[in-house]
Regions:
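Hydrophobic beta-sheet segments that form the core/acyl-binding groove
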Residues: 1-8, 89-96, 104-106, 110-114, ...
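Residue-level recognition of short, solvent-exposed, well-ordered loop/turn junctions
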Residues: 47, 101-103, 231, 255-256
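Hydrophobic alpha-helical segments and helix pairs
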Residues: 76-129
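A short secondary-structure junction signal
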Residues: 64-66, 88-90, 117-122, 140-144, ...
């Protein structure tokens, strides 16, 4: 099943999820009538997430573009509910951040409690998939290309990756049965400048395959659940392919007015404009 999440003032929590009838129409979960998606305000596919476990350095080409070896075990970090925003909502560049970057990622949604599961059993705990954007303050993270000579950054990934609005999520959830081979999914991203000679033009950034993961989804679930029990509604954001802004020459970062677009074939996309803290971008 493929579902679409949207804002609905008629519900108790202001949130509704309907079955996608086609790319332009969703079935109203209350009365069953078809509703045009163009008339709806998207919400995150998961209205509320539990734990958000993110994986660093999990695509071979992403390691290659940094000149670092492939990790021998998954690299974990986390985001929280404060970071979650919907398609069309603004990414807020925090005060003091000058190197805002983004990454398209496949989000794996947990459907059954998982504690110390094996690789062989791991996929039985997956309910489905979403597209997410891992937004990063690269200067806070301490990524060398984002720093001026002599600067160090604070190296605090929790702050650099977990700031408010740093987890845009698309409105579409696709159940696991609809995607028998998630390793075949194509991940792409674009930056759309808000000003300058390329204003309004979608500039390709990333174009990769989930087959290029260092650790596949079963391996990630087994590794995480060995130490951290995964509950229904938890999310594993599985890493990103090459092409991110910080490792380009010269580096490319998001500026206020720019739009970040992330897309996964067979799932959908999430698109968000950047604004500075305290500044509304039209």
């Amino acid at each position: 099943m493929r579902t679409f999440a949207y804002r609905d003032a008629a519900t108790a929590d202001g949130f509704a999820v309907g079955e996608l009838l086609d790319d332009a129409t969703v079935r109203d979960p209350i009365d069953g009538r078809p509703r045009p998606i163009a008339e709806l305000t998207p919400a995150p596919a998961l209205a509320r997430t539990g734990k958000v476990i993110c994986i660093g350095l999990n695509y071979r080409d992403h390691c290659d573009e940094q000149g670092v070896p492939y990790p021998d075990r998954p690299m974990l970090f986390a985001k929280f509910g404060n970071a979650l925003i919907a398609d069309g909502e603004p990414i807020v560049r925090p005060e003091g951040c000058q190197a805002l970057d983004f990454e398209v990622e496949l989000g794996v949604v947990i459907g059954r409690r998982a504690t110390r599961v094996t690789v062989a059993d791991a996929m039985a705990h997956v309910s489905g998939y979403v597209v997410v954007n891992d937004v990063s303050a690269r200067d806070w993270q301490g990524a060398k290309p984002a720093l001026a000579p002599g600067e160090r950054g604070d190296g605090q990934w929790l702050r650099a990756k977990g700031s408010d609005t740093f987890l845009p999520m698309g409105p579409v959830f696709v159940s696991a049965g609809e995607i028998p081979d998630p390793g075949a999914l194509r991940l792409r991203s674009w930056r759309i400048p808000g000003s300058g000679p390329d204003a309004g033009r979608a500039i390709p950034m990333q174009d990769g395959s989930a087959a290029n993961m260092v650790f596949d989804i079963p391996a990630l679930i087994a590794f995480v659940s060995n130490a951290i029990t995964l509950e229904p509604g938890d999310l594993i954001s599985t890493g990103t392919p090459a092409g991110v802004g910080v490792f380009r020459d010269p580096p490319v970062f998001l500026e206020p007015g720019d739009v970040a677009r992330c897309e996964i074939g067979g799932i959908g996309q999430v698109e968000n404009r950047v604004m500075d803290a305290g500044t509304q971008v039209p």
